[in-house]
Amino acid sequence: DLLVSKLKSSLPLTSIYNRLGFDFGTVGNHEFNYDLPYLKQTINQLHYPVLCANIIENAQPFTGQGIHYFKVNGLTIGTIGLTTQYIPHWEQPDYIKTLTFNSAIHTLKSELPTLREKSDIVVVSYHGGFERDLDSGLPTEALTGENEGYDILRQFSDSIDVLITGHQHRDIATIKNQTAIIQPGSKGTKVGKIVFEYTHDKKVLIKECN
């Protein structure tokens, strides 16, 4: 949600992000607050891929890419970006009239098998949060589909090594069913860190998540 601002001048922010050297990014719901052409202009200023596999325009991810692969120490990292499907409930219709917002669950069912097959480590970057308590499974909000993080874990934890979340502005760093889960606060106040160990045959173990 920090990618664009109401000043209608995104260059100062994107310049900072480019200097930080991110491998990929994902859009949040507030990125749509200032119309689609401005958002696309901002994305084009970035030197890394912005992933959003579940928001579609002309039969493809509206950012141009939903999945990205890159190498770290000989390991293939496969990443998919997803954003809460609930944006049409808040946003001005004219700003998003060319877009289709799909469920993160629906998109993962389609894309995750291939992503898992091609990757040593699978990272799901989801601008959405958790609709249920991670320990008890009890609902923490109305189950509207705005947040699908708990259901993502329930259905796909065997195929996901890292689940990066957001939207709810919570401080979460934990491991559930061998999936590292982080949600590093809001407004750039926290940084999430996940440390992996791996063997020569590329068997990956999560060492820490904080």
Where do the language-model regions lie?
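Acidic, metal/ion-coordinating pockets
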Residues: 1-210
